């Protein structure tokens, strides 16, 4: 692994991230068809979701409200509203996330997987939670030892800027801001970049940890799919 020490991460130059021109908002049937073709051609994709935050006691999240999938060259954002199950995006999400041929990589994906299952009935397959996989390689049980910020610092020598102000914005809004779009796209795209770097520079460790992570994710209890109204 990189020699960057955790206490120097905040002094590193910023991670530049994905460009706005490389982000696709999937809204129409044509957008969905293009996204499906591009993503199904990938061997691995970056993956994350965003949900509108809940602030009141007892309030139940209706997320995810945004699903982000990234190839090496682009990020695709799918807005998941109340009628998402019948939207053009739903078919893409089912086909890509349930495909056993595509590895899905991200950080801290437990809630994302549960919410996708509850809202859309998606059983995501071949998942690598990089926070778990990288922690296993390092031989530490420290829960937050390998978040995206730490991985970017140690692998790329850059500082990943995570704005809490953007994190807690309304992800259910029909019109996302440019800041929201870039933040969300980066979350998925940087996960794939980290996965590629890990596989290229530490192939044996990556292969073993990835196999264990996929096995654990696929063995997780599966809830019954929600019944859609007739």
Predicted segment positions?
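N-terminal accessory regions of nucleic-acid-interacting proteins
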Residues: 1-45, 83, 130, 202-230
